[in-house]
From Swiss-Prot:
Transmembrane segments: none annotated. It catalyses: 5,6-dimethylbenzimidazole + nicotinate beta-D-ribonucleotide = alpha-ribazole 5'-phosphate + nicotinate + H(+). Pathway: Nucleoside biosynthesis; alpha-ribazole biosynthesis; alpha-ribazole from 5,6-dimethylbenzimidazole: step 1/2. Catalyzes the synthesis of alpha-ribazole-5'-phosphate from nicotinate mononucleotide (NAMN) and 5,6-dimethylbenzimidazole (DMB). GO terms for biological process: cobalamin biosynthetic process. NCBIfam families: cobT_DBIPRT, PRK00105.1. Keywords: Cobalamin biosynthesis, Glycosyltransferase, Transferase. The keyword Transferase applies. One of its GO terms (molecular function) is nicotinate-nucleotide-dimethylbenzimidazole phosphoribosyltransferase activity. Belongs to the CobT family. The active site is at 305 (proton acceptor). Signal peptide: none annotated. It comes from Roseobacter denitrificans (strain ATCC 33942 / OCh 114). This is Nicotinate-nucleotide--dimethylbenzimidazole phosphoribosyltransferase.
Length: 337
């Protein structure tokens, strides 16, 4: 595939010319929903969810047949400061687990009929410690964005992205704070389960990173300076999905931080996205409010690897099946009250 962009300015150009959902399909789907054999509003949020999906797919009676889940993995220079309860080598070990079918996301993808792809990004070369320097050069962040862009299957009709990377809740907290404001304590959570001392280290690292990169004002530059390769890859995949009009189910805190960097650059960048779930990472709720995305599920998950969004795929599948498969009052010969 020819590179879609080679500079961050070219990514910004894409963000300035994003396609919109199809208004006619939205109107037609809403009209059909109003004639289905149920009281108005009886399916709750499923109704608006299905109409949203129809608008992005450009058809009033859509189907979900080719969902795609992509998990990106990366390593972080800040991990050396003790921000995680697990060592950095766990990232590569978990990638092998994904590839061998042994992780939670493998089971969920199989259960809901989704294609699962796993991409490890230069695990042998962690990003720079962002308390000392930008996490990535422009060339490195472009490479990661492009990995995500290329990973999206153009034939997919739903996209879910997730991550694996020791230390990435810390980089996500720094990125969220840089994009949406607030103190480090507002955004830093326990991640993999650090104790109070580990939590204090995470807060210090985020504070130092924010101070070092305080003059960076653009969302993509914040992603470069504070993010990680897998975080940038998720952003690239989310952006590619928008260009292809593929609806996206967002996963947890780290995925939403990646999405937030796009929104910080272009406020309408996430209109094709729905939050799949609210995770147990304490600041995820704050981040969902910042990006304006109420979650579909709240199950206390804090695993990452796209697991919560994968579960929400079942909700979207059900919503779309009802819109497209239910009979109208006229078709069923039922009196419309």
């Amino acid at each position: 595939m020819t590179a879609a962009f080679s500079t961050l300015d070219e990514v910004r150009d894409i963000l300035r010319a994003l396609p919109e959902s199809d208004a006619e399909s939205i109107d037609d789907a809403a009209a059909r929903n109003g004639q289905l054999t149920k009281p108005p509003g009886a399916l709750g949020r499923l109704e608006a969810l299905a109409i949203w999906y129809a608008g992005w797919r450009g058809v009033a009676t859509p189907r979900i047949e080719t969902p795609q889940i992509i998990v990106f993995a990366g390593n972080h220079g800040i991990a050396a400061q003790g921000v995680s309860a697990f060592p950095a080598e766990v990232t590569a070990q978990m990638v092998l687990n994904f590839q061998h079918g042994g992780a939670a996301i493998n089971q969920l993808a199989a259960t809901f009929g989704a294609k699962l792809d796993v991409h490890a990004l230069a695990l042998e070369q962690p990003t720079a410690d962002f308390t000392q320097a930008p996490a990535m050069s422009e060339a490195e962040v472009i490479d990661a964005l492009h990995t995500g862009w290329q990973a999206v299957d153009a034939a997919a009709d739903v996209l879910i992205v997730g991550e694996m990377g020791i230390g990435n809740t810390t980089c996500a907290a720094a990125l969220a704070a840089a994009c949406f404001g607030g103190a480090p304590a507002d955004w830093v959570g326990r991640g993999t389960g650090v104790d109070d001392a580990g939590l204090a280290i995470k807060q210090r690292v985020v504070a130092e990173g924010l101070a070092r990169h305080a003059t960076v004002h653009d969302g993509l530059e914040k992603l470069r300076c504070l993010g990680g390769r897998e975080v940038a890859a998720m952003a690239g995949a989310i952006l590619r999905a928008r260009v292809l009009r593929i609806p996206v189910l967002l996963d947890g805190f780290i995925c939403c931080a990646a999405a937030g960097s796009l929104m910080h650059t272009a406020p309408d960048a996430l209109e094709h996205c729905v939050a799949g779930h609210l995770s147990a990472e304490g600041s995820h709720d704050r981040l969902l409010q910042a990006i304006g995305k109420p979650p579909l599920l709240s199950l206390g998950l804090r695993l990452g690897e796209a697991s919560g969004a994968a579960l929400s795929l079942a909700v979207l599948q059900g919503a779309v099946a009802c819109l497209s498969g239910m009979a109208t009052f006229a078709e069923a010969g039922v009196a419309d009250g």
